[in-house]
From Swiss-Prot:
This is 5-keto-4-deoxy-D-glucarate aldolase. The keyword Protein biosynthesis does not apply. It holds the Pfam family HpcH_HpaI. Its cofactor is Mg(2+). The record marks D89 as: Increases basicity of active site His. Substrate binds at Q151, S178, D179. Pathway: Carbohydrate acid metabolism; galactarate degradation; D-glycerate from galactarate: step 2/3. Belongs to the HpcH/HpaI aldolase family. KDGluc aldolase subfamily. GO terms for cellular component: cytoplasm. Gene3D superfamilies: Phosphoenolpyruvate-binding domains (3.20.20.60). One of its GO terms (molecular function) is magnesium ion binding. Catalyzes the reversible retro-aldol cleavage of both 5-keto-4-deoxy-D-glucarate and 2-keto-3-deoxy-D-glucarate to pyruvate and tartronic semialdehyde. In vitro, can catalyze the aldolisation reaction between hydroxypyruvate (HPA) or pyruvate (PA) and D-glyceraldehyde (D-GA). The condensation of hydroxypyruvate and D-glyceraldehyde produces 2-dehydro-D-gluconate as the major product and 2-dehydro-D-galactonate. The condensation of pyruvate and D-glyceraldehyde produces 2-dehydro-3-deoxy-L-galactonate as the major product and 2-dehydro-3-deoxy-D-gluconate.
Length: 256
């Protein structure tokens, strides 16, 4: 068995409520992803929803993270079984599912990552995740080593947070602050009191069901507040944001 992913250390850390500090990867480049993997983050999101990623760009990034202590988490573009199956086959074990609004959608996400009879994942006997058929116990181990994080970012999701958090196979609840702010009528203002109240409510309800919660918080004060509120897995920045900020600061140092 591949000791890099079995057992899934990120999944185990979440179950133990160990704080996991992460970073968002949106540059879609194996070199920048490799640098992130050397930085010491507990987890990294490789974004397939808003970043220009696909199967052909994800594979070299996974290769770049081989041996890194940072757990790769893929945000899928949509909660669709075929897309999820292909990402499983290339070697992802940790999934962030966007825009989950109901228990049924959460159940579909879980089922998409499990082989029958627990789920509906299609079977290929030779792919990158099982080292092209050379991992003898892959099928026996796979189902219990998948992490499913579902993203709540709408009013309906907030309304159904208890049912979503109680879904078997869901390992954590992730808040999408920007979309949630837009859904609550505060586009571009995730700091609005209504949005902050909703975020804290989601954290509290996740905790009530024994599930860890997470969020993207590139502003340090926000990240520390969310950790104080009980968030377990927090992405504290992005490669794109760090790169833009650092290059702008460097230019300003000499141009202004």
């Amino acid at each position: 068995m591949n000791n890099d992913v079995f057992p899934n250390k990120f999944k185990a850390a979440l179950a133990a409520k160990q704080v996991q500090i992460g970073c968002w990867s949106a540059l879609s480049n194996p070199i920048s992803t490799e640098v992130l993997g050397l930085a010491g983050f507990d987890w990294l999101v490789l974004d397939g929803e808003h970043a220009p990623n696909d199967i052909s760009t994800f594979i070299p990034q996974l290769m770049a993270l081989k041996g890194s202590a940072s757990a790769p988490v893929v945000r899928v573009p949509t909660n669709e079984p075929v897309i999820i199956k292909r990402l499983l086959d290339i070697g992802f074990y940790n999934f962030l599912i966007p825009f989950v609004e109901t228990k049924e959608e959460a159940e579909q996400a879980v089922a998409s990552t499990r082989y029958p009879p627990e789920g509906i994942r299609g079977v290929s006997v030779s792919h990158r995740a099982n080292m092209f058929g050379t991992v003898a116990d892959y099928f026996a181990q796979s189902n219990k080593n998948i992490t499913i994080l579902v993203q709540i970012e709408s009013q309906q999701g907030v309304d159904n947070v208890d049912a979503i958090a109680a879904t078997e196979g869901v390992d954590g609840i992730f808040v999408g602050p920007s979309d949630l702010a837009a859904a609550l009528g505060h586009l571009g203002n995730a700091s609005h009191p209504d949005v902050q109240k909703a975020i804290q409510h989601i954290f509290n309800r996740a905790s009530a069901h024994g599930k860890p919660s997470g969020i993207l918080a590139p502003v340090e004060a926000d990240a520390r507040r969310y950790l104080e509120w009980g968030a377990t897995f927090v992405a504290v920045g992005s490669d794109l944001g760090v790169f833009r900020s650092a290059t702008q600061k460097l230019a300003d140092t000499f141009k202004k």
